[in-house]
Amino acid sequence: MSKFWSPFVSGLVPYVPGEQPKLTRLVKLNTNENPYGPSPKAVEAMRAALTDDLRLYPDPNSDLLKHAVADYYKVQPNQVFLGNGSDEVLAHIFHALFQHDASLLFPDISYSFYPVYCGLYGIDYEMIALDDQFQIRAEDYAKPNAGIIFPNPNAPTGCLLGLDKVEQIIKASPDSVVVVDEAYIDFGGETAITLVDRYPNLLVTQTLSKSRSLAGLRVGLAVGHSDLIEALERVKNSFNSYPLDRMANVGGAAAFEDREHFESTRNKVIESREALVEQLQGKGFEVLPSAANFIFARHPQHDAAALAAKLREQGVIVRHFKQQRIAQFLRISIGTPEQHQALLEGLSDI
């Protein structure tokens, strides 16, 4: 601890991101990136924006992208918030909407950034246990709270909560903000954005990193009632008025407009996921139902940490979590057929 630190910094437990190896020959199945490239129209839009205008600040409101998102989801632009990746959007949500006297509620197995944000902003929280099938029990959230947040599909399990159960949670807490974190929704679920006009306490977050193949661009969004969006804008403009650069604005807008590319790559990921599930089950793995671009699997005869280490020795990287309830699972990102073949060959050697 440095004498120059603010006192609270020594108590922070930072988020640990998935490994980004420098060696390109590795088969990288650990951070849920899309194996297929972004929309060619998005790439062309960004190339066209490489002009002398880069000397100018970008639009602080990102109106081009904001209107593209609003048109896509059939909402008003003042119902859309944009940030530098969904992690920044989530950080602003925790700061703007969850600092109350009661405890914030979220699942015991969920996105590990949630407790990090709570520590950063001094938010009390309670983790609600998933059931034995790693599913949310909606009735467990019908209790006093400072807000509710959960990933759907779940990260890291990939399990999907049906929209009827999502709505049950929202209805039970009309005086609290309910955030549905939909980073992976496009790979097998129905978005809760269809509910935002009915529930002023609902906020839905998404990212362009997964189904739009733009993880390197850092674009996240939230959709909800304009009152919630205003709170986020106030926090954003007290922190960084220009979170999205010119490339993100034009590239993100073009990605939303290119529905054909989106549908094509999404369908390829889903087909590859189902094929990999069958192949892993054929090798004795137990695989949880997944609505995401990854699967969560365990083998009854092999320790998960040891499997991950041995796969790495063979040039294949997957994600292992040390958390007690899931310590025997591996999270495996959906890749190309060639990457899956390398994974399966590595497992055969083990």
From Swiss-Prot:
One MF term in the entry's GO annotations: histidinol-phosphate transaminase activity
GO biological process, one term: L-histidine biosynthetic process
Record keywords, A-Z: Amino-acid biosynthesis, Aminotransferase, Histidine biosynthesis, Pyridoxal phosphate, Transferase
InterPro entries per UniProt: Aminotrans_II_pyridoxalP_BS, Aminotransferase_I/II_large, HisP_aminotrans, PyrdxlP-dep_Trfase, PyrdxlP-dep_Trfase_major, PyrdxlP-dep_Trfase_small
PTM-bearing positions, type N6-(pyridoxal phosphate)lysine: 210
Pathway: Amino-acid biosynthesis; L-histidine biosynthesis; L-histidine from 5-phospho-alpha-D-ribose 1-diphosphate: step 7/9
Catalytic activity as recorded in UniProt: L-histidinol phosphate + 2-oxoglutarate = 3-(imidazol-4-yl)-2-oxopropyl phosphate + L-glutamate
EC number(s) from the headed UniProt entry: 2.6.1.9
Cofactor(s) required, per the database record: pyridoxal 5'-phosphate
Pfam families: Aminotran_1_2 (PF00155)
NCBIfam families recorded: hisC
Subunit structure comment from the entry: Homodimer.
Family recorded in the similarity comment: Belongs to the class-II pyridoxal-phosphate-dependent aminotransferase family. Histidinol-phosphate aminotransferase subfamily.
UniProt cross-references to HAMAP family, sorted A to Z: HisC_aminotrans_2
Protein's name according to its UniProt entry: Histidinol-phosphate aminotransferase
Lineage: Bacteria, Pseudomonadati, Pseudomonadota, Gammaproteobacteria, Pseudomonadales
